[in-house]
Structure formats: structure tokens, C-alpha cells
């Protein structure tokens, strides 16, 4: 009986830490957004970042055209610190030199009819340590603390994997729907062409078996 109470208390503490780690992992994902980018259009986003802070940008085109987009990032002085054209996906990490509003834009201006769907994940700063004074402590982690760190890393891996598979599933579904539409249109076109050819052959065969009777006209002197 005496050992069951500490075990129950330790189990409750571990479950509480797991819940906090789960909420923390979700909160530390940063700004994620999936948006529509019309043809011949540009969409920009702004974020104020302190000096000496690292930020990262990951993006991927989910649907539309050749699954490509133009992207560039500007610092507060208007200088281009990143530019790529017609990229399907990419990642960019940068440590700021000045404080101010940084702007990153996605452009579909090179396309005149392809509508795009773009996903991006924008994160600012380094992830804080899971445990207080974790970077400065000289003692070894306890078994529970080590378990929490391991679980936290596993949760991060799970979240990243879920995001990857979610984007991949959305992209594959869009391609399948586009292929299905093309097959449907092609089938309708073949049906119409087959009907026209069949009708023409019937008329041609009918003309072969139609007797042409001479027309007698009276000649008046």
C-alpha cells in the first residue's frame, strides 16, 4: 500500500507533463497557412522580427498548373534576401541583421490561367528548452525528465510527418481529380466523334443502295 501512492502520483505527474508537452508542441508550430493564389496574382505576408533572431520559411504548392510558384523575401530596408522562381517547394532560413517588418511574397503572375493552392510554415526564433535551465544544468536528467525529452522529440517527428503526409495526400488527390476530369472530357469527345462517324457511315452506305431513277422530260417541238 505504501508504494502504490507514490507510483500513482508519479503516473499522474507524467501524464500532466505529457499533456503540457503536447500542447507545447502544437503551439511551437508557428504560423501555418494554406491559401488560394489566383492566376496572374501576388500574395504577400508581413512579420515583425527582432534583430539577431532566426526565422525559417517552408512552402509547397499543393495544386494548380505545374505545381510551381515564385517566392521572394524582403528585409525592412527593401533588400531581397531570398528569391526563387517556379519552385514546387523550398525552405529558407535566415538570421536577421536589422529589426523591422520582413515581407515574404508568393507570385503567380507568370501564369495566365492556372489557379494555385500554396501551403507555407513560417517560424520565428529558436525553440526554447523543454525543461527550465536545461542548457546550463550540470546534473544529469532524471528518468522522468529524459522520458519527457524523448516523448517531446517523438511528438515533433509525428507532427512533421503528419504535415508531410497531409500535403502529399492533398496534392495526390488534386492530381487524381484533374486526371479524372481529363479522362471524362476525353471520353465525351470520343463518344461524340464515334457517333458522328457512325452516322456518316450510315448515310454513305444508304447512298450506295439508293436507286437513281432517270427523269423523262417531254420534248416539245
From Swiss-Prot:
Residue interval(s) of motif COPII vesicle coat-binding: 208-209
Coiled-coil portions: none
Keywords: Cytoplasmic vesicle, Endoplasmic reticulum, Golgi apparatus, Membrane, Methylation, Protein transport, Signal, Transmembrane, Transmembrane helix, Transport
Signal peptide: 1-30
GO cellular component assignments: COPI vesicle coat; COPII-coated ER to Golgi transport vesicle; endoplasmic reticulum; endoplasmic reticulum membrane; endoplasmic reticulum-Golgi intermediate compartment; endoplasmic reticulum-Golgi intermediate compartment membrane; Golgi apparatus; Golgi cisterna membrane
UniProt modified residues of type Dimethylated arginine: 103
Residues annotated as domain GOLD: 42-124
Spans through the membrane: 185-205
Subcellular location: Endoplasmic reticulum-Golgi intermediate compartment membrane; Golgi apparatus, cis-Golgi network membrane; Golgi apparatus, Golgi stack membrane; Endoplasmic reticulum membrane
Regions of this protein lying in the Cytoplasmic compartment: 206-221
InterPro entries on file: Emp24-like, GOLD_dom, GOLD_dom_sf
Pfam families, sorted: EMP24_GP25L (PF01105)
Lipid bilayer topology: Single-pass type I membrane protein
Origin: domain of life: Eukaryota
Assembly and interaction partners: Monomer in endoplasmic reticulum, endoplasmic reticulum-Golgi intermediate compartment and cis-Golgi network. Interacts (via C-terminus) with COPG1; the interaction involves dimeric TMED3; however, there are conflicting reports on the interaction. Interacts with GORASP1 and GORASP2.
Entry function: Potential role in vesicular protein trafficking, mainly in the early secretory pathway. Contributes to the coupled localization of TMED2 and TMED10 in the cis-Golgi network.
Entry similarity comment: Belongs to the EMP24/GP25L family.
Name the record gives this protein: Transmembrane emp24 domain-containing protein 3
Origin organism lineage: Eukaryota, Metazoa, Chordata, Craniata, Vertebrata
Amino acid at each position: 500500500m505504501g508504494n502504490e501512492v507514490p507510483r500513482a502520483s508519479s503516473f499522474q505527474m507524467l501524464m500532466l507533463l505529457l499533456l503540457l508537452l503536447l500542447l507545447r508542441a502544437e503551439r511551437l508550430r508557428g504560423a501555418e497557412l494554406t491559401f488560394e493564389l489566383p492566376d496572374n496574382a501576388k500574395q504577400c505576408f508581413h512579420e515583425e522580427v527582432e534583430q539577431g533572431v532566426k526565422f525559417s520559411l517552408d512552402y509547397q504548392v499543393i495544386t494548380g498548373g505545374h505545381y510551381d510558384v515564385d517566392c521572394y523575401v524582403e528585409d525592412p530596408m527593401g533588400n531581397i534576401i531570398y528569391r526563387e522562381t517556379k519552385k514546387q517547394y523550398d525552405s529558407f532560413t535566415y538570421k536577421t541583421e536589422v529589426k523591422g517588418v520582413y515581407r515574404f511574397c508568393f507570385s503567380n503572375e507568370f501564369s495566365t490561367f492556372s489557379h494555385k493552392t500554396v501551403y507555407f510554415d513560417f517560424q520565428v526564433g529558436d525553440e526554447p528548452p523543454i525543461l527550465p535551465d536545461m542548457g546550463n544544468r550540470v546534473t544529469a536528467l532524471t528518468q522522468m525528465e529524459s522520458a519527457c525529452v524523448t516523448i517531446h522529440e517523438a511528438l515533433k517527428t509525428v507532427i512533421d510527418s503528419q504535415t508531410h503526409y497531409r500535403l502529399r495526400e492533398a496534392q495526390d488527390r488534386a492530381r487524381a481529380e484533374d486526371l479524372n476530369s481529363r479522362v471524362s472530357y476525353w471520353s465525351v469527345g470520343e463518344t461524340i466523334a464515334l457517333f458522328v462517324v457512325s452516322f456518316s457511315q450510315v448515310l454513305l452506305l444508304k447512298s450506295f443502295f439508293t436507286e437513281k431513277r432517270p427523269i423523262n422530260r417531254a420534248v416539245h417541238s
